[in-house]
Regions:
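Conserved beta-strand termini and adjacent loop/short-helix elements that scaffold enzyme active sites
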Residues: 59, 134, 159-161
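Membrane-embedded segments
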Residues: 47-49, 64-149, 153-157
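Short acidic-hydrophobic surface loop/beta-edge motif
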Residues: 54-58, 162-169
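Alpha/beta-hydrolase fold active-site loops
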Residues: 68, 171-172
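Acidic, histidine-bearing metal-coordination/catalytic regions of metal-dependent phosphoesterases
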Residues: 1-69, 80
Length: 172
């Protein structure tokens, strides 16, 4: 059910995040395993380089998740690749998308002194089903415990050696 939704959503996002095509794509998989992708070339946010929208269906995902909006963000590398304005743009964009849940894929920062700022910014994204994160290689360095503390303070669920089940409209 929901675990399949999360697994296939993350898998699809990771797979298609490296695509450079601006054309729409329909998966050759059967309808019950369908992922449709389109790339939005202009996000309206100067510092946000790429926004992609996917529609996903799977026979095991309950009808309660119809219209569920998941967001995925990763590799922000705050302060080397992404500056303050870009971080504000991303959090504003994520809030404007009215997501049900946000998935964070790690590599959030480029220095321990930036951990509180980047996690606080992501913590203000309003998601009724929650914000979930995994850590990247940059996140396991010197400030690992600072990241854990900041994520807990912001209500971000760290999925480290564990899983969670999303619940929506009576479905799981």
């Amino acid at each position: 059910g929901c675990k399949s939704l999360l697994f296939f959503s993350v898998l699809g996002l990771l797979f298609f995040s490296s695509c450079r095509s601006t054309q729409s794509f329909t998966s050759p998989l059967p309808e019950e395993y369908s992922i449709r992708m389109s790339k939005s070339s202009a996000s309206g946010y100067k510092n946000v380089k790429r926004v992609r929208k996917y529609e996903f269906t799977h026979r095991d995902v309950p009808a309660a998740f119809d219209g569920c909006r998941l967001g995925f963000v990763s590799d922000l590398h705050y302060r080397s690749l992404l500056k303050e304005k870009g971080l504000r743009d991303i959090t504003r964009l994520l809030n404007n998308l009215r997501l049900d849940a946000l998935l964070i894929g790690g590599d959030l920062h480029e220095g321990c002194e930036y951990v509180p700022d980047v996690i606080a910014a992501l913590g203000v994204v309003k998601t009724p089903l929650g914000t979930y994160a995994v850590l990247g290689n940059n996140d396991y360095e010197a400030c690992y415990h600072d990241i854990l503390k900041e994520m807990e303070r912001q209500g971000i669920h760290l999925l480290e050696h564990k899983a969670d089940t999303l619940k929506r409209n009576g479905g799981r």
